[in-house]
Regions:
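Loop/turn positions that initiate beta-strands
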Residues: 55-58
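Compact, glycine-rich, soluble single-domain proteins
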Residues: 5, 14-47
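Short, Lys/Arg- and Gly-enriched loop/turn segments at beta-strand edges
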Residues: 65-72
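Eukaryote-biased recognition of intrinsically disordered, low-complexity regulatory segments
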Residues: 1-7
């Protein structure tokens, strides 16, 4: 197991996992996410190849539609 910081919270994950593995484990919709890994935005095309290591910091932001056009 390794320790990462996910959205500001410590999290233990299995060693050798990628960003895509993490997204899958969290059951998040990949098409609506932005991922920052150690202060760098990672393109979705690289999620499978970007391995997570002990001490990494990951921020995952999920885009949600909605709002009111009348208040613009």
């Amino acid at each position: 197991m390794i320790s990462i910081v996910l959205n500001g919270e410590p999290k233990e994950i299995v060693e050798g996992k990628s960003i895509m593995d993490l997204v899958d484990t969290l059951n998040l919709p990949a098409e609506r996410l932005a991922v920052e890994h150690n202060l760098k935005i990672i393109k979705r095309a690289h999620w499978n190849s970007q391995a997570l290591e002990d001490g990494d910091k990951v921020e995952i932001v999920q885009f949600v539609g909605g709002g009111s056009a009348g208040n613009c």
